């Protein structure tokens, strides 16, 4: 390595990332760094701030944070790897990717990670040190090479990669073992691949992930923030052997991409277990028998079952021998069986027995809590520090991160540090006295948000340990000063913050100087007087600059407008139980699914249906095959028991039947007279036209169907089911191509939970922010609650236009 002894006269230094400066940064909303080396600057945009960071010479700028309401930019030498991250309002943290990454691109010229040992384990010498070796590359002479501490670097563009001088007097320098970043190649099965290849192995152009044309799909980027579903780049969000994409060819739904394997060893896979933790992706035990006692087939063999879950396709999943494993993100470890009649089964793995203290702050797999956000609106008193409800959804609809988890956001708001705050599960809480309950989110790019909760009016009771949950008071409808959604269109006269501080006039510059939110710069925002407004569309609602010199801005406490009853669909007045079982499952709380109806012939229940307006019920077309005369049918609304009907049920005749004209399994029934909308009889919401339910969304089915002898026969039962993307559901192992794009799958692949005979035509509803949406009509399945055979439902969003046309014209 003689050239390292030479003073290089010229280096071709290419900055990573050209064009938009922000492409080189990772962003996190609501995050701030506790930095000791920083500069505060006044700028008008995040792009300006990025330029300032790039041009800084007095220190290496690794991050910056931007405060939009202050128009303030803070550039910093630290990042989240070197200093604590704090929760803060009105701030976005931007961190340079190159300083967060512990992998190298190409030869590692721009590697800025923290590896400080060589391949043989020798400790690196500091670049600024003179002993034991006098360096030719020093921080002073090479300020752009990132020669920090004793970290491995490649200041001379060595093709063999990063290196360092060593602390061994006998060894002047050695190369370091730095893994390759997965933007030019892939490790394992490519689930962390973040490159920009956007064509399939046959050369087809990839369809953008945020598009539903030409192929509708459930891999929606906003629902999978950790999967990096950007642009139309090849990705692997569902555990396939390698990255893939939907294609722009209407005749080819999806195809694998040709991504080369990285030549360096893969990154550590994290802790492994001899017992079941989470979904068992890290299980490395030696159980080799399925739940029914069948012996497992060896992963490397193709007999009796041919498959692609091979050690070659999943090199990081330890597919040794015939041991049960979970290489592709199934609910639990499984294996192919040696029985030619049974392709595969799950295995029975003992649960890990460990105390919470052993796992809660580790990077162990996180068990995501079940959906708990109540649809019956809870409220909180004061600033919500006494709130003890079960809401776990933020104001923008994001799911909350469990308080004991450090993924995706590391934090100090733990049950140990705040023992009196009741930091249970992932429920919204207010441990630090903020303006209302909040939580960390499961979106890596959004650290925290306030929760989708209302403040109690004077007559309401909050969700506390001693008080029952109450429905938001109807008296709120008399409020004249109220907001819709985030209040961007609010034009009321509220002029004090939630803390009671008077607002500063928008045209004033005292006590706070500002230029971005003034009547002149925002003429359409109606910035009159000192009234609360939301000119920037802040998710937390209207705000104002305050007259307190120590408080730049704060939010205003303005109630939400009460929706008219016609817009109140999908909101039962009794909170659903939301249990995870149907066949062998649980009995629903009476009238908690008030849109569920019973279709009857000759007094007998035979199918379910869903009330979508006072005069109209949606059901399955196959339920109406035997008799075309609508007078044969009766619709029972508000029932909980199948046979012993309550006195206040409504029984309606059917005057008209409408079958979908292209023979889809969906139909509309017009009732003989409008149903009276009550707490027990209430319509579900229709989805937006062509809306796609995201893969793994938790939805609910209800019905009086066959229960296989389980408890609750004759009573309305419910089940929680995950939606399964059609691409997955149509695998050979499951429904083998039978599911059409106008249908959706939902169910537990382990079996035991499903809709069944008598449930046909009934609803599959999915919770969205604050209400239930009718996304599916129970249609068909291969058997009932069978292993690897999920239920199939008509995708209602594909027929919304037809449904609305029929109702409008009849």
Swiss-Prot record:
Transmembrane segments: none annotated. Residues 1-19 form the signal peptide. PROSITE patterns: KRINGLE_1, KRINGLE_2, PAN, TRYPSIN_DOM, TRYPSIN_HIS, TRYPSIN_SER. It is found in: Secreted. Residues 103-181, 185-262, 275-352, 379-456, 482-561 form the Kringle domain. The modification Phosphoserine is found at residue 598. InterPro entries: Kringle, Kringle-like, Kringle_CS, Kringle_sf, Pan_app, Pept_S1A_plasmin, Peptidase_S1_PA, Peptidase_S1_PA_chymotrypsin. Disulfide bonds join 49-73, 53-61, 103-181, 124-164, 152-176, 185-262, 188-316, 206-245, 234-257, 275-352, 296-335, 324-347, 379-456, 400-439, 428-451, 482-561, 503-544, 532-556, 569-685, 579-586, 607-623, 699-766, 729-745, 756-784. SMART domains: KR, PAN_AP, Tryp_SPc. Residues 582-808 form the Peptidase S1 domain. Residues 398-418 are annotated as: Disordered. Belongs to the peptidase S1 family. Plasminogen subfamily. This is Plasminogen. It comes from Erinaceus europaeus. The gene is PLG.
């Amino acid at each position: 390595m003689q050239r390292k002894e030479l003073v290089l006269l010229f280096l071709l230094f290419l900055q990573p990332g050209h064009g938009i400066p922000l492409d080189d940064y990772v962003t996190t909303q609501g995050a701030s760094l506790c930095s000791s080396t920083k500069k505060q600057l006044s700028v008008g945009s995040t792009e300006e701030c990025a330029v300032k960071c790039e041009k800084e010479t007095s220190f290496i700028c690794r991050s910056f944070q931007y405060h939009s309401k202050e128009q303030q930019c803070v550039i910093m030498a630290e990042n989240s790897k070197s200093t604590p991250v704090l929760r803060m309002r009105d701030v976005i943290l931007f961190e340079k990717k190159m300083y967060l990454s512990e992998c190298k691109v190409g030869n590692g010229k721009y590697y800025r990670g923290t590896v400080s040992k060589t391949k043989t384990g020798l400790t690196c010498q500091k670049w600024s040190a003179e002993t034991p070796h006098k360096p030719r590359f020093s921080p002073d002479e090479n300020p752009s090479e990132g020669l920090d501490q004793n970290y491995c670097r490649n200041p001379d563009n060595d093709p063999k990669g990063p290196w360092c001088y060593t602390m061994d007097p006998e060894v002047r320098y050695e190369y370091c073992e730095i893994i390759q970043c997965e933007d030019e190649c892939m490790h394992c099965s490519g689930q962390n691949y973040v490159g920009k290849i956007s064509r399939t192995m046959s050369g087809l152009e990839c369809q953008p992930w945020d598009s539903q044309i030409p192929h509708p799909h459930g891999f929606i980027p906003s629902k999978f923030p950790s999967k990096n579903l950007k642009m139309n780049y090849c990705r692997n969000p569902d555990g396939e052997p390698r990255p893939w994409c939907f294609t722009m060819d209407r005749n080819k739904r999806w195809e694998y991409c040709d991504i080369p394997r990285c030549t360096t060893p893969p990154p550590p896979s994290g802790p492994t277990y001899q017992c079941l933790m989470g979904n068992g992706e890290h299980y490395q035990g030696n159980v080799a028998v399925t739940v029914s006692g069948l012996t497992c087939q060896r992963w490397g063999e193709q007999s009796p079952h041919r498959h692609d879950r091979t050690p070659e396709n999943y090199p990081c999943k330890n597919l040794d021998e015939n041991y049960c494993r979970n290489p592709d993100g199934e609910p639990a470890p499984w294996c192919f069986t040696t029985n030619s009649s049974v392709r595969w089964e799950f295995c029975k793995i003992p649960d890990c027995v460990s105390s919470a203290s052993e796992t809660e702050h580790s990077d162990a797999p996180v068990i995501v809590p079940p959906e708990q956000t109540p649809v019956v609106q809870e409220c909180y008193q004061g600033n919500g520090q006494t709130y003890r409800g079960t809401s776990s959804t933020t104001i923008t609809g994001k799911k909350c991160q469990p308080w004991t988890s450090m993924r995706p956001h590391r934090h100090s708001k733990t049950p140990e540090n705040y023992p009196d705050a009741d930091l249970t599960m992932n429920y919204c809480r207010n441990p630090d006295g903020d303006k209302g309950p909040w939580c960390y989110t499961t979106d890596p790019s959004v650290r925290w948000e306030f929760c989708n909760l209302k403040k109690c009016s004077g007559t309401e009771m909050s969700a506390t340990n001693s008080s029952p949950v109450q429905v938001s008071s109807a008296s709120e409808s008399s409020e004249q000063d109220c907001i819709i959604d985030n209040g961007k269109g609010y034009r009321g006269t509220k002029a004090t913050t939630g803390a009671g501080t008077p607002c500063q006039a928008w045209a004033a510059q005292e006590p706070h100087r500002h230029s971005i939110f003034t009547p002149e710069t925002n003429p359409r925002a109606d910035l009159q007087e000192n009234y609360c407004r939301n000119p920037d569309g802040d998710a937390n609602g209207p705000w104002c600059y305050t007259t307190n010199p120590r408080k730049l801005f704060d939010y205003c406490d303005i109630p939400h407008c009460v929706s008219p009853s016609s817009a109140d669909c999908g909101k039962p007045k009794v909170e659903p139980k939301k249990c995870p079982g149907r066949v062998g499952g649980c009995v629903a709380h009476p009238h908690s699914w008030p849109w569920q109806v019973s279709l009857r012939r000759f007094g007998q229940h035979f199918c379910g249906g869903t009330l979508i307006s006072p005069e109209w019920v949606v059901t399955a077309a196959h339920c109406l095959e035997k008799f075309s005369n609508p007078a044969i049918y009766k619709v029972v609304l508000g029932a909980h028991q199948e046979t012993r009907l309550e006195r206040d049920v409504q029984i309606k005749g059917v005057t008209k039947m409408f079958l979908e004209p292209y023979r889809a399994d969906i139909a509309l029934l017009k009732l003989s007279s409008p149903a009276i909308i009550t707490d027990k009889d209430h319509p579900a919401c229709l989805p937006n036209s062509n809306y796609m339910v995201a893969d793994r969304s938790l939805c609910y089915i209800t019905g009086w169907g066959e229960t296989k002898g389980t408890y609750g026969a004759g009573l309305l039962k419910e089940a929680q089911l995950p939606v399964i993307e059609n691409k997955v559901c149509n695998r050979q192992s499951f429904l083998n191509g039978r599911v059409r794009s106008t249908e959706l799958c939902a169910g537990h692949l382990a079996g035991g939970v499903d809709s069944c005979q008598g449930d046909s035509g009934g609803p599959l509803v999915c919770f969205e922010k604050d209400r239930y949406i009718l996304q599916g009509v129970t249609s068909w399945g291969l058997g009932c609650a069978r292993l690897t055979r999920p239920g199939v439902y008509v995708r209602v969003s594909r027929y919304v236009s037809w449904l609305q046309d029929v109702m409008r014209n009849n």
